[in-house]
UniProtKB/Swiss-Prot annotation:
<keyword id="KW-0472">Membrane</keyword>
<feature type="transmembrane region" description="Helical">
    <location>
        <begin position="67"/>
        <end position="87"/>
    </location>
</feature>
<keyword id="KW-1003">Cell membrane</keyword>
<dbReference type="GO" id="GO:0005886">
    <property type="term" value="C:plasma membrane"/>
</dbReference>
<dbReference type="InterPro" id="IPR003705">
    <property type="entry name" value="CbiN"/>
</dbReference>
<comment type="similarity">
    <text>Belongs to the CbiN family.</text>
</comment>
<comment type="function">
    <text>Part of the energy-coupling factor (ECF) transporter complex CbiMNOQ involved in cobalt import.</text>
</comment>
<comment type="subunit">
    <text>Forms an energy-coupling factor (ECF) transporter complex composed of an ATP-binding protein (A component, CbiO), a transmembrane protein (T component, CbiQ) and 2 possible substrate-capture proteins (S components, CbiM and CbiN) of unknown stoichimetry.</text>
</comment>
<protein>
    <recommendedName>
        <fullName>Cobalt transport protein CbiN</fullName>
    </recommendedName>
</protein>
<keyword id="KW-0406">Ion transport</keyword>
<keyword id="KW-0170">Cobalt</keyword>
<keyword id="KW-0813">Transport</keyword>
<keyword id="KW-0171">Cobalt transport</keyword>
<keyword id="KW-1133">Transmembrane helix</keyword>
<comment type="pathway">
    <text>Cofactor biosynthesis; adenosylcobalamin biosynthesis.</text>
</comment>
<keyword id="KW-0812">Transmembrane</keyword>
<feature type="transmembrane region" description="Helical">
    <location>
        <begin position="5"/>
        <end position="25"/>
    </location>
</feature>
Length: 95
């Protein structure tokens, strides 16, 4: 391997491992990694907001909700990949 590739690989490893070493267990109890959804939901419920509508169907568990989210992301990625491939193929065939 070229020296440049080895240095780049070492840089990637250092950048990947450094946050794990620096934040190993720190901040979990303080809520640093709570997420935007949790904080936004708490901010909305503090004002006494009542929803206008009820969901038509609510998933029975968090795992199914995660599955549906992953399925939605996969379908979106397939559509985007198809569109990029279509336009790239159309551009190559016109040349």
């Amino acid at each position: 391997m070229d020296k440049r590739h080895i240095l780049m690989l070492l840089a990637v490893i250092i950048i990947s491992v450094a946050p794990l070493i620096i934040y190993s267990g720190h901040g979990e109890d303080d809520g640093y990694f709570g997420g935007a959804d949790d904080s936004a939901g708490d901010a909305i419920t503090e004002t006494g907001y009542k929803p206008w509508f009820q969901p038509l169907w609510e998933p029975p568990s968090g795992e199914i909700e995660s599955l549906l989210f992953a399925l939605q992301a996969a379908i979106g990625a397939l559509i985007i990949g198809y569109v990029f491939g279509y336009y790239r193929g159309r551009g190559e065939s016109s040349e």
